[in-house]
Amino acid sequence: SRSAKSLPLCQDLPFEILAQKMFAGMNSSSLLAIPFFILAGNIMSRSITGKLIGISNAFIGWIKGSLALVTVVASALFGAISGSGVATVSAVGGTTIPAMKEEKYPAHFAAAIASMASILGPIIPPSITLIVYGSITGVSVSKLFLGSVIPGVLLALVLAGYALFYGKKHDLPAHKRRSPKEIACTVKDGIWALLMPVIILGGIFGGIFSPTESAAVAVIYALLISFFVYKDMSFKDLGSVLIDSSIST
């Protein structure tokens, strides 16, 4: 187009240099973390979402409106794995919204709390949004992750507080309180899922590996526990996960 042809003339740059500059803008190792975190999130959404929800429900299911609170907690945990709001609302909201509607929660509230909780994904590290921002501005992605921890936790607490308030005000249903033995069994079953955000964030903040390396570790860990621990994913499922991740990326 004419605008494309006039761009190098306006900047007194030859086309070769312009092409190099365009490539240099995308030539960042930090950006490699994005497809890896998306892939890890998609793998885990097929495997561990139910585990995270089950653990959350085991501890707080006895509170009125507990499913809304479980949605917030599970979204925070899943956000610490995928770094994506879309993946979070798809994985967690896709499970908890139908469950809330089945227990006669107002449909608008169920959709709203799941949507709001999903924004924890782009805030709580490893946030894909922060990876892109750091790549563009040259700011350390690890420092961005560290700076987003407190805002993410505060937002999760605000959402949890509102879920508690709404549940008590509207007398929403609660589940039976679990015994310590039942809670221990649920945690034991889902402990591998809980370890994933610990490995990712602990490795980054502990200086063990970079955000990009942590994303690769997350994919390997997700594959290992999905295929060999929980055994709830097949190679056929992996193919569809790879396609979905490519589209999302």
Predicted feature locations:
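Alpha-helical transmembrane segments of multi-pass membrane transport proteins
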Residues: 1-249
